[in-house]
């Protein structure tokens, strides 16, 4: 009985570990970055941000900071350095 329990525990651990693979990272630049982001956002069902959502702020100079991802941009995160799909999706 103990052997069967040990085998079941080992198989469960192996199966769990195989699903916990790190997400692949790639470098996306230029047209490839724009196309990949558009495809991912479309698949995720996210509409493109419009200027209308920023109208309540009243000042155009606040627009870049209202959704804020610190001072970094998608080029810094995904072109200059490799990034994951999760990072790309955060820009949708």
From Swiss-Prot:
Entry GO CC: extracellular space
GO terms, molecular function: growth factor activity; hormone activity
InterPro entries for the chain: Bombyxin, Bombyxin_A, Insulin-like, Insulin-like_sf, Insulin_CS, Insulin_family
Signal peptide positions (record): 1-19
Pyrrolidone carboxylic acid: residues bearing it: 20
Disulphide-bonded residues: 29-79, 41-92, 78-83
Key words of the record: Cleavage on pair of basic residues, Disulfide bond, Hormone, Pyrrolidone carboxylic acid, Secreted, Signal
Compartments in which it is found: Secreted
Residues making up the propeptide: 50-71
CDD domains with a match to the protein in the record: IlGF_insulin_bombyxin_like (cd04366)
Anything else known: Silk worm has two kinds of PTTH: 4K-PTTH and 22K-PTTH; there are many forms of 4K-PTTH.
Family named by the database record: Belongs to the insulin family.
Described purpose of this protein according to its UniProt entry: Brain peptide responsible for activation of prothoracic glands to produce ecdysone in insects.
Assembly and interaction partners: Heterodimer of a B chain and an A chain linked by two disulfide bonds.
Protein's name in the database: Bombyxin A-9
Source organism: Bombyx mori (Silk moth)
Gene behind the chain: BBXA9
